[in-house]
Amino acid sequence: LLLAGLCCLLPGSLAEDPQGDAAQKTDTPPHDQNHPTLNKITPSLAEFAFSLYRQLAHQSNSTNIFFSPVSIATAFAMLSLGTKADTHSEILEGLNFNLTEIPEAQVHEGFQELLRTLNKPDSQLQLTTGNGLFLNKSLKVVDKFLEDVKNLYHSEAFSVNFEDTEEAKKQINNYVEKGTQGKVVDLVKELDRDTVFALVNYIFFKGKWERPFEVEATEEEDFHVDQATTVKVPMMRRLGMFNIYHCEKLSSWVLLMKYLGNATAIFFLPDEGKLQHLENELTHDIITKFLENENRRSANLHLPKLAITGTYDLKTVLGHLGITKVFSNGADLSGVTEDAPLKLSKAVHKAVLTIDEKGTEAAGAMFLEAIPMSIPPEVKFNKPFVFLMIEQNTKSPLFIGKVVNPTQK
């Protein structure tokens, strides 16, 4: 059994064609009034995001981090529909769901509403998700599992001959490549001949900055990886009004930058020596307060252009969050098939990020704003920083990352 997740985040002009038939689009009313179960799972999603982030940060303080909490949580919540006993409870508890406070049915209903909302058409923001089940032709799958993953997670099912590993790998990778518009390729590099079932989740984001940077203003500047290492990076620059302020609790500058549509990027620039403090203090409640409060002021902003990739074997890191049984010989996946005992052999997640000046298709577009006469602070993201990408309607953490070295591939 293989579980693979992937995501892609791109700024820039929107593609002319819609995503295609891989992702389902549904009109969704505003979630605050009509989606109480979604409101119930969002805090758990955020805390899962920070728990997973802290585990990855603990493993290495010298590498970039980038992943999609929504993608990983969706894949494992979907998989939990086919698990039983300890395997089942471990997954949901590892995703930070307290089943004494929220019934399991509401967890899955919350994900159903989340996926519906994320896939809602938006003329200014391209955001699509997809779930694919690749099943061995000889595998007899429990009907209820297929029905549940289709109805609750909008999943598509594909019949595959896993004995032909090259062809099966090609099918999975083609599905992924199509879903991410060619940005994530060769997600699955190796496939075991014994594989009978693969679950793939993707999330694709492409947005335009509400207030783009001017390409002409970008210049090469120093980025201080650590006290001994400095690299040259293209630094986007703009003097203007920003939703930015210094948060004493986090010992960090906090910058919120909106995309056109329903997404916001939050950047955290920690004070000297305060990166770990920032990482330990981030919570769902703090993020919610940032999103609800506007703190506009003038600033001279320097933000590096980015192109980073995060690839993770989740078996180890999720083990630290208590999800172990599903990877062991004692796994109970009898809700998927009763043919033979299954275990999750591999869980792969890949995320791709690009941040640049792009943000408008209009040639010669210009944006002017009034700047107070007082000297604005200069805020340079020229040392390791943390960032989040939030979907505004659901307050869901689409992506979370840390930039230690912008030149690291």
Swiss-Prot record:
GO terms for molecular function: serine-type endopeptidase inhibitor activity. Keywords: Acute phase, Glycoprotein, Phosphoprotein, Protease inhibitor, Secreted, Serine protease inhibitor, Signal. Residues 364-383 are annotated as: RCL. Residues 18-39 are annotated as: Disordered. Residues 1-15 form the signal peptide. Glycans are attached at residues 61, 98, 136, 262. GO terms for cellular component: extracellular space. Its main location: secreted. It is found in: Secreted. Plasma. Coiled coil: none annotated. The keyword Phosphoprotein applies. One of its GO terms (biological process) is acute-phase response. The record marks 373-374 as: Reactive bond. The modification Phosphoserine is found at residue 374. Interacts with CELA2A. Interacts with ERGIC3 and LMAN1/ERGIC53. Interacts with PRSS1/Trypsin. Inhibitor of serine proteases. Its primary target is elastase, but it also has a moderate affinity for plasmin and thrombin. Inhibits trypsin, chymotrypsin and plasminogen activator. The reactive center loop (RCL) extends out from the body of the protein and directs binding to the target protease. The protease cleaves the serpin at the reactive site within the RCL, establishing a covalent linkage between the carboxyl group of the serpin reactive site and the serine hydroxyl of the protease. The resulting inactive serpin-protease complex is highly stable. Belongs to the serpin family. This is Alpha-1-antitrypsin. It comes from Papio anubis. The gene is SERPINA1.
